């Protein structure tokens, strides 16, 4: 019979390897890879990329989409905290839940006060590959089977932002698992994971 500590350690090990995504990171079909601000249809819109390979254009500014996402995840949009409980600055990694930790990377030239930063989720089963862009201080981000995404920051800076977000994500998940461990009841652990998965579909 598996003990509570073994169960939690097993979940942590699988989490670190990216396994059992349906159990740990909600339904992969609806799992977000990134949000990219764009003017493609002539207005301020957002491209949404999903783990299952879908790419959808939403005719809403990214500011509205992230606000709605925060509310859906039960968060206060203007008070998203870091993994150590501090209020997150504008371009710091943003944690919306165990399945959503975003790195801010500049994706377009600024026009007025429109959002210029895309949000790249590091809690996904893909690795981001960063290559040189067509101009100095630009890069291409390659992920999954999507076309390369042009960003307006150097490869070194982009890698730093992605690593920073991954570190924040790991700290958050480690703390979440530590809190679950306090329950001393494997049944509670299982129910928490199942309930969380159902609520985040």
State where each predicted segment sits.
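Eukaryotic intrinsically disordered, low-complexity regulatory linkers and tails enriched in Ser/Thr/Pro
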Residues: 1-201
